Regions:
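Short hydrophobic/alpha-helical segments at membrane-entry points of transmembrane helices
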Residues: 77-85, 211-212
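Central cavity-lining transmembrane alpha-helices of secondary-active solute carriers
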Residues: 27-45, 250-261
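Conserved MFS/SLC helix-loop-helix module at the cytosolic interface between two early adjacent transmembrane helices
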Residues: 38-79
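Cytoplasmic helix-loop-helix junction between adjacent transmembrane helices
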Residues: 82-123
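Glycine-rich segments within core transmembrane alpha-helices of 12-TM secondary carriers
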Residues: 111-139, 144-153, 252-260
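Extracytoplasmic gate region of multi-pass secondary transporters
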Residues: 204-260
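Extracellular/periplasmic helix-loop-helix junction of adjacent transmembrane segments
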Residues: 1-37
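Central mid-sequence intracellular linker of multi-pass
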Residues: 109-114, 137-205
Length: 261
């Protein structure tokens, strides 16, 4: 989304300009999602095996570095930027599937709905970031967006490694009382029990399962088309300046957050 805003800038004082056609711009945006898809299933399994702390933390750290290096990749050429975007998608694709393994050890069943609503409403971050990025581009150039957001993400990734642990038992800084409270509220999963076979045929021939798949697919496609193309529409069709573009492009994400509160 950050790059989408940057690619709409046409004024010279906003930073270097690159002679990419529309197909190349869409490739730069699209390859992020190819990388994002690849790590969805492996991300969850890696978190179960290695722990979400190291898996998510590594993804955050690598994504931060890639964000900081994005202006350099753009200067080096189109293919370098495509590779950087693809790797960024790989790094960030592990986050959502890595959440359940750690959440089941920290979040009590009574708080699960609240926790998931906040996770789903993470679009608040987009709603805040878009207007800020618009002003950053207007005053300091498009590269400043990557340096500022990359630096914030880098700081957060270091905080993640320091603050987050895979289970209450591993955390050295919470009290015994809190550990006992979590132990009583969260029932541990008995991994020694024999797992029943997965009913693949029943799942693949189930109408409700396919309804959920199709619903999520259509919603996801619609969301990400708007996610990528809304700033372009604001710029090329409505002719908003970069500050107004960021502000108005953020409104759908603010509405999404409000609807989930």
């Amino acid at each position: 989304m950050v790059f989408r805003n940057n690619s709409n800038v046409t004024q010279e004082d906003h930073g270097p300009r690159y002679d990419w056609d529309e197909e190349e711009k869409n490739d730069i945006l699209g390859y992020f999602f190819w990388g994002y898809v690849i790590t969805q299933i492996p991300g969850g399994r890696l978190s179960e095996k290695l722990g979400a702390k190291i898996v998510v933390g590594t993804g955050l750290l690598s994504a931060s570095i890639l964000t900081l290096l994005t202006p350099v990749a753009a200067h080096m050429g189109y293919l370098w930027l495509v590779v950087a975007r693809f790797c960024l998608g790989v790094s960030l694709g592990i986050h959502w599937p890595s959440t359940p393994p750690i959440a089941t050890k920290w979040i009590a069943p009574a708080d699960t709905a609240t926790f998931m609503s906040h996770m789903t409403a993470s679009s608040l971050g987009v709603a805040v970031t878009l207007p800020v990025c618009g002003y950053l581009i207007a005053y300091w150039g498009w590269a400043s967006v990557f340096y500022v957001t990359g630096s914030i993400a880098l700081t957060w990734s270091l905080c993640w490694f320091y603050l987050i642990y895979d289970s209450p038992e591993e955390h050295p800084r919470i009290s015994t009382t809190e550990k006992e409270k979590l132990r009583l509220e969260i029932k541990p999963v008995n991994t020694s029990l024999k797992k029943p076979p997965i009913p693949w045929m029943k799942m693949l021939t189930s109408g409700p399962v396919w309804s959920v798949i199709m619903g999520n697919t259509c919603a996801g496609c619609t969301f990400f088309v708007a996610f990528n193309q809304l700033p372009t529409y604001m710029s090329h069709v409505l002719h908003f300046n970069i500050k107004a573009n960021g502000l108005f492009s953020s409104l759908p994400y603010l509405g999404k957050k409000c609807s989930l509160c």
